[in-house]
UniProtKB/Swiss-Prot annotation:
A GO-annotated cellular component: cytosol
Enzyme class per UniProt: hydrolase
Gene3D superfamilies: P-loop containing nucleotide triphosphate hydrolases
Catalytic activity: ATP + H2O = ADP + phosphate + H(+)
Organism: Shewanella oneidensis (strain ATCC 700550 / JCM 31522 / CIP 106686 / LMG 19005 / NCIMB 14063 / MR-1)
Motif (DEAD box): 165-168
Name of protein: ATP-dependent RNA helicase RhlB
Domain Helicase C-terminal residues, every copy: 243-390
Record carries keyword Hydrolase: yes
E.C. designation(s): 3.6.4.13
Function description: DEAD-box RNA helicase involved in RNA degradation. Has RNA-dependent ATPase activity and unwinds double-stranded RNA.
Domain Helicase ATP-binding intervals: 40-219
Amino acid sequence: MSQTHLSNQKFADLPLHPEVKQALAENGFEFCTPIQALSLPVLLQSKDIAGQAQTGTGKTMAFLVATFNHLLSSSIPEGRQLNQPRAIIMAPTRELAIQIAKDAILLAKHTRLKVGIVYGGESYDVQRKVLDQGVDILIGTTGRIIDYVRQGIINLNAIQAVVLDEADRMFDLGFIKDIRFLFRRMPNADQRLNMLFSATLSMKVQELAYDHMNDPVKVEIAPEEKTSKNIKEEIFYPSQEDKMRLLLTLIEEDWPEKAIVFSNTKHSCENLWSWLEGDGHRVGLLTGDVPQKKRIRILEQFTQGQLDILVATDVAARGLHISDVSHVYNYDLPDDCEDYVHRIGRTGRAGNKGVSVSFACEEYALNLPAIETYINHSIPVSNYDRDALLDDIPSPVKIHRKHPAGARNLRERSGAGRTPGAHRSGGRPPRHDRTRRQP
């Protein structure tokens, strides 16, 4: 294969259930990614897996294919009740759970298996109606799953397959006690297929695996490569005064098809949104306090191309599967080295090329040495000509506090005097090659 992100292993050559093969073929899945090629032969023998793989490697489809195949090839537990799912997939964030559910629905099309999803931020009653009808594969965040288990709405005695995705993130967010609580209410480890995936297989993650899994096979994909070779990284050292002007100038030069701008705080993200919106970009804002329905709407707009730029805190850095992100801008260097890897991992996915641009300003430059040590390479430095930065930038729009993240509503109240999205429809032309020179 000339596409290095795929292996030579075809899904059609694996001993998969016919309905799974049909769904894969209809959705264009022909060749496995490396993590799929390594893990599926093991899982199809009903052996447990502890897999190390970063986001964007295809691990989601690996555990979904294995889960569907296992349920379709196994007998339904005797005496199973309507409130007893046969498989459970746990994710650290609702965004990741939603994406997993979307992929699961693709595989479920030709099967009799029902997929359900539960997570915080949505109505208990709405989700309960789905559960009351019975689900075979339950996908969700641990907190909401535990709520339903404690209420007796869900019973885990018929679980035949378990997936724990992004286990390292589960530790970061303090969910491990919840996970152990759920494991203790399932059949014994040797009576179910167990799958754990993590960006790092640290000692604490491996301990969790061996405590609640049946002698799992360890599968690793290029653990020494923290960042993808498909991502072109660079870093600027702007003054605080130049920082916003530099970002706006670079965006106008790069003209990204789809970009994510990361900042470390909600306040900074809101400020970024205001300037980008005022400059005529189609931009959405995603922070931790955005209501779930609005969050889903913004992500759909970004995915469907109605928005070109997403401004986000690290709530969006993990678990989002958004294709064709061409650029990532780290307006602030993150305090956590792993967050840098997860941020820039939003681009350069599935063999595509991507660009990551970071700013080492006075406030966050001290984070850079630890990041470069963690990723095991220096980030190339780019310089800029201060006199070439944009100087005719419109004023930022003001955020209406009752509607903190709805780009459409905010634009209607901005009074900025420019056509929304003017850059994309014949507005001010981009100023190419005005800021960069060879370092």
